[in-house]
Amino acid sequence: METLCHRLNVCQEKILDCYELDSDKLVDQINYWTLLRYEAAMFYAARERNLRTINHQVVPATTVSKQKACQAIEMHMALQSLNKSDYNMEPWTMRETCYELWCVAPKQCFKKGGITVTVIFDGNKDNAMDYTSWKFIYIYDNDKWVKTNGNVDYTGIYYTVNSKKEYYVQFKDEAKIYGAQQWEVYMYGTVITCPEYVSSTCSDALSTTTTVEQLSNTPTTNPLTTCVGAKEAQTQQRKRQRLTEPDSSTISPLSVDNTNNQIHCGSGSTNTGGHQSATQTAFIVHLKGDTNCLKCFRYRFTKHKGLYKNVSSTWHWTSNTKTGIVTIVFDSAHQRETFIKTIKVPPSVTLSLGIMTL
């Protein structure tokens, strides 16, 4: 028992060291996933011996430990294979090699440089969806890794391998989901109409200025091509609008388009997580993720007590006992931005902004 406790302590300390190192070397990411394999294996072995806690940590259920072990093995093997390719000397951050990004479409491949693609259905700005195109996609094809570029056209979002387009988002299928007869695709505020429907769609297209200011969350310095989707042959009677999102933002490892591991918040941004009312309010951050990971992360950032006002213990909603939550309270929006820029958030932890009435 003492040996297991010691090994788990050493393993988790090294995992936290990987977070603080913030390396962009592939060998360091392989080491990180090796440690996660060891941690999951130790939790699994402890549960098999009917141990409920280790070092005051709750031992996950056998199925949970097994699932995490399988994920770690999958990522470890994929990264080891990538390390033997021509791309092993490229920068590889923890964010770019996390399991969540590995599972995002296109699945089971590595991706870099996310670009937001906004699709407006039926010309209604309230019935819009955001998708992600990738600047670089690394595909394992014919026993080797191939680097290709992501692209967008009026049909969907795709990449090209062996001169063949592989679509991982089809706008025609998405239009059926949202009850649309036609769609418009915007990227960086630029719109290009489908050649077959120039006359019927150009008059209804939104202006580029409106798109840049209201729809695009990405810089407009690199104009990329986008397009307007064609009308569907059959008119669907039912139309579903996406509800307008509240004035709060959620930052997660997968939603950041940068390729580094730092979360950026512009000082001039008006999205501060909500509007202050006449009552006393406080700016907050919710950290969501695995309970054990949150406890370790909370312990590490307590040495930066000047960057926040107060922090809660780990809690969870009664309907979801697997996901833990830590709430951090700030005196001002500026203090919150400083905290986000200073503290490195693990890729398995989701960061959400908001306000709370006191």
Curated annotation (Swiss-Prot):
Keywords: Activator, DNA replication, DNA-binding, Early protein, Host nucleus, Isopeptide bond, Phosphoprotein, Repressor, Transcription, Transcription regulation, Ubl conjugation. Its main location: host cell. Pfam families: PPV_E2_C, PPV_E2_N. The keyword Transcription regulation applies. It is found in: Host nucleus. GO terms for molecular function: DNA binding; DNA-binding transcription factor activity; nucleotide binding. Residues 246-255 have a biased composition (Polar residues). One of its GO terms (biological process) is viral DNA genome replication. Residues 281-358 are annotated as: DNA-binding domain. The keyword Transferase does not apply. GO terms for cellular component: host cell nucleus. InterPro entries: E2/EBNA1_C_sf (IPR035975), Nucleotide-bd_a/b_plait_sf (IPR012677), Papillomavirus_E2_C (IPR000427), PPV_E2_N (IPR001866), Reg_prot_E2 (IPR033668), Regulatory_protein_E2_N (IPR036050), Regulatory_protein_E2_N_1 (IPR042503), Regulatory_protein_E2_N_2 (IPR042504). Residues 1-199 are annotated as: Transactivation domain. There is a cross-link at residue 288 (Glycyl lysine isopeptide (Lys-Gly) (interchain with G-Cter in SUMO)). Phosphorylated. Sumoylation plays a regulatory role in E2 transcriptional activity. Residues 224-255 are annotated as: Disordered. Plays a role in the initiation of viral DNA replication. A dimer of E2 interacts with a dimer of E1 in order to improve specificity of E1 DNA binding activity. Once the complex recognizes and binds DNA at specific sites, the E2 dimer is removed from DNA. E2 also regulates viral transcription through binding to the E2RE response element (5'-ACCNNNNNNGGT-3') present in multiple copies in the regulatory regions of the viral genome. Activates or represses transcription depending on E2RE's position with regards to proximal promoter elements including the TATA-box. Binds DNA as homodimer. Interacts with protein E1; this interaction greatly increases E1 DNA-binding activity. Interacts with protein L1; this interaction enhances E2-dependent replication and transcription activation. Interacts with protein L2; this interaction inhibits E2 transcriptional activity but not DNA replication function E2. Interacts with protein E7; this interaction inhibits E7 oncogenic activity. Interacts with host TAF1; this interaction modulates E2-dependent transcriptional regulation. Interacts with host BRD4; this interaction mediates E2 transcriptional activation function. Belongs to the papillomaviridae E2 protein family. This is Regulatory protein E2.
